[in-house]
Amino acid sequence: MRIVEVTENKKQYLNLLLLADEQEDMVDRYLYKGKMYVLDDDGVKCECVVTDEGNGILEIKNIATVPPFQRKGYAQALIEFLVEKYRGQFSILQVGTGDSPLTIPFYEKCGFVRSHIVPNFFTDHYDHPIYECGVHLVDMVYLQRPL
């Protein structure tokens, strides 16, 4: 298993990016300003995009695993890679997600704790309703983990 930075042709991973953020123009807002990493384990299994949000905060903007390989530890391995790589350069690793029974427990298992909420984020910024595990996502829930 190896994790590599993608510096060119990031859109080749669009189908994977859209698993985590299903509207392409929203992905475009951070894809090229962020750093992208892919986890390769006999083929790409997982990707993430992180951005420098200032004030010592590194934010995971997108993280997704190829569906047949979900729940096998790939996303968690990618998060641990980020923690090790950016420790000392940033003080906080942050992620924003919907209030979903799928994502919140995953991030909490990875050591994140709830930080704050941006009300109506999904209803204000997406051109269609977003559902995950049958839950209509409205607010963006931010979680943080110290680096």
Name each region found by the language model.
Residues M1-N9, V141, L147:
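Conserved N-terminal entry element of GNAT/NAT acetyltransferase domains
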Residues V4-P67, I79:
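Acetyl-CoA-dependent GNAT
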Residues G34-M36, L137-Y142:
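Short hydrophobic/aromatic beta-strand or adjacent loop that forms the aromatic wall/cage
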Residues A64, D99-P101:
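Active-site-proximal loop/turn and secondary-structure-junction residues that shape catalytic pockets
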Residues F69, G73-F81:
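Conserved acetyl-CoA pyrophosphate-binding loop and the N-cap/start of the following alpha-helix
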Residues K85-D99:
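Conserved GNAT acetyl-CoA-binding A-motif
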Residues Q94-G96, E108, V113-H136:
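Conserved catalytic-core motifs of GNAT/GCN5-like acyltransferases
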